């Protein structure tokens, strides 16, 4: 049994290589890991939502319509029976971690037991060592714990054999997760999204927040200041590209704890020290900081990409792809198909990289600050083609909670179902929501109301299209939306009040585009982007209402905001006698 902090990260990398869970690549520090694969429809390459269950009491089974729940005693009986003997013949690694900076009021300790040295190596890149912190518990059981086993292994490299018995059961009452018959990090790394769920449960039964947020420092030119922003974006809505904008710094890319601080602000910490990121479409043009880190010598785990002559390749990397190599399906060649006749891509669409944030040249110096950083603004990113402007500011904190609770993400590919369907994603957290949504929203309201200096809240939409189907935003335009939001937190810009929130004035955006992007921002662009589309916005309110009507105990303030916004939009329609109102008319 290997444990404590004495078995350093290098030791677990070496053991993972010895056991075949990882293999060395050409660049020093780079390794490759492959997860199990039987076909494009049957694999261990992504989170298994079907077999991820939240264990609750019998009386709570109907409180969580958006997640899988199971009666606790039944679930424990099932998963413990499957886990009986699951580590036979394996080594068990015992690891002590700290979720958040060391010696911080924010942080929660976490214990991981696993028989995978790949999991142990990944967690050492992603989390802070916590053995010394555990010694200071003095017998307290106030920590999360996670038990994981890959189960019976097969093949070379060794992968989980019995995917049909894959289980990831989250025991809220005990503050633990039991995970078996899997290796993919989203299922096996207890401290990742599994700990996010435990954190949400704990925070919402206390007086703080656990959120699916990035944390970044925003640095306007010539201002000699840093404003810190958090942001929640559903998948494919611009989260990473926002957090990694040029000239800015990153504290964290995924999960944050927030507390009311003595200076009157909400302060936030990154509970992690690394990034477990989707590698698809990371390239030198769009993601220069990450791409440089991934193509230079440093400790990095690649998973489920193609390896050719010791070099990793992935979908959308901007390079000429080889016609053959080794990937998650074994020996790969262009045109290879699985047992069902489905084409196997060069790398899995959910292929990943694991790296310490300190390896990025835009890391913020406050990454390990035990006091966290003051939150000046919060961004909620949605995706729709015809409704929301590129950015709006909430009218107040409660309206900001409403904006976060109203995030929609539009499906973009037929492989995900019907294209163009709006999916509700409150705070980009719905998949991890282990408390009733009404309680979660009410706690957000109460949290902000306890602050003397509550963050300004903004909603973004980088995917608005013209009637001809052309995107109205350039890829880097989001830098100007962010800097406008930063200026609003510092009271530098005026704004136009609309029924859905505050929108920028043209002159301010024109100046930002000129200064930061060297672009002429036209009145035509401004008009198209910030027109209030009444019919579309009313339809959005109808969708929100339909979703929340399925929930119990949604707080009154939420319904009041929704109703008032509907009234105000209809009044605007009557005033101008048309469906689309230009921002110039509202001024």
Locations of regions flagged by a protein language model:
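Beta-sheet entry/capping signal
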Residues: 1, 91-94, 213-215, 226-230, ...
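A contiguous, mid-domain pocket- or channel-lining segment that forms the substrate-recognition surface
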Residues: 88-90, 95-156
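Short secondary-structure boundary/capping segments
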Residues: 109-116, 246-248, 264-275, 283-286, ...
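Charged, amphipathic alpha-helical linker segments immediately N-terminal to NTP-binding catalytic cores
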Residues: 150-212
């Amino acid at each position: 049994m290997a444990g404590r902090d004495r078995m350093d990260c290098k030791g677990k990398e070496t053991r993972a290589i010895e056991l075949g869970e990882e293999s060395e690549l050409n660049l020093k520090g780079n390794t490759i890991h492959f997860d199990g694969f039987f076909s494009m429809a049957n694999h261990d390459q992504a989170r298994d939502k079907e077999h991820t269950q939240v264990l609750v009491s019998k009386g709570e089974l109907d409180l969580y319509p958006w997640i899988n729940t199971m009666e606790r005693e039944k679930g424990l009986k099932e998963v413990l029976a499957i886990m009986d003997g699951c580590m036979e013949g394996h080594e068990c690694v015992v690891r002590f971690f700290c979720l958040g900076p060391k010696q911080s009021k924010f942080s929660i300790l976490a214990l991981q037991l696993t028989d995978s040295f790949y999991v142990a190596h990944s967690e050492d890149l992603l989390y802070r060592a916590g053995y010394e912190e555990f010694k200071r518990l003095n017998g307290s059981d106030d920590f999360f714990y996670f038990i994981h086993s890959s189960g019976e292994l097969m093949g070379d490299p060794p992968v989980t054999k019995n995917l049909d018995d894959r289980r990831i059961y989250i025991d809220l009452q005990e503050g633990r997760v039991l995970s078996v018959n899997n290796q993919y990090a989203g299922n096996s790394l207890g401290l990742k999204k599994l700990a996010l769920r435990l954190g949400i449960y704990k925070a919402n039964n206390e007086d703080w927040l656990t959120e699916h947020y990035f944390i970044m420092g925003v640095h306007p030119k010539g201002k000699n200041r840093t404003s810190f922003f958090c942001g929640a974006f559903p998948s494919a809505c611009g989260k990473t590209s926002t957090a990694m904008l040029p000239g800015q710094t990153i504290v964290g890319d995924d999960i944050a704890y927030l507390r009311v601080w003595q200076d009157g602000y909400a302060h936030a910490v990154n509970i992690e020290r690394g990034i477990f990121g989707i590698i698809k479409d990371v390239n030198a043009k769009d993601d220069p900081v990450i791409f440089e880190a991934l193509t230079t010598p440093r400790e990095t785990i690649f998973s489920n990409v193609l390896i050719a002559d010791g070099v990793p390749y992935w979908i959308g990397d901007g390079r000429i792809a080889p016609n053959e190599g080794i990937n998650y399906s074994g020996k790969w060649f262009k045109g290879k198909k699985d047992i069902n006749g489905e084409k196997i891509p060069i790398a899995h669409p959910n292929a990943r990289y694991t790296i310490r944030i300190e390896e990025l040249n835009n890391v913020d110096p406050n990454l390990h600050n035990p006091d966290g950083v003051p939150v000046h603004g919060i961004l909620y990113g949605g995706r729709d083609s015809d409704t929301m402007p590129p950015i709006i500011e909430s009218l107040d904190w409660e309206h900001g909670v409403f904006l976060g609770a109203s995030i929609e993400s539009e499906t973009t590919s037929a492989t995900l179902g019907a294209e163009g369907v709006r999916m509700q994603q409150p705070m980009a957290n719905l998949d991890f929501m282990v408390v009733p949504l009404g309680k979660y929203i009410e706690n957000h309201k109460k949290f902000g109301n306890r602050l003397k200096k509550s963050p300004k809240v903004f909603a973004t939409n980088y995917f608005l299209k013209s009637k001809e189907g052309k995107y109205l935003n350039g890829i880097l335009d989001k830098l100007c939306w962010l800097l406008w939001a930063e200026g609003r937190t510092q009271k530098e810009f005026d704004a136009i009040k609309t029924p859905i929130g505050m929108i920028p004035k043209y002159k301010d955006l024109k100046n930002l585009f000129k200064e930061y992007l060297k672009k002429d921002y036209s009145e035509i662009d401004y008009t198209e982007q910030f027109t209030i589309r009444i019919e579309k916005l009313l339809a959005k309110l109808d969708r929100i209402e339909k979703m929340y009507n399925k929930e119990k105990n949604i707080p009154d303030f939420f319904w009041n905001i929704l109703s008032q916004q509907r009234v105000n939009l209809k009044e605007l329609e009557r005033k101008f006698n048309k469906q689309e109102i230009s921002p110039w008319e509202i001024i």
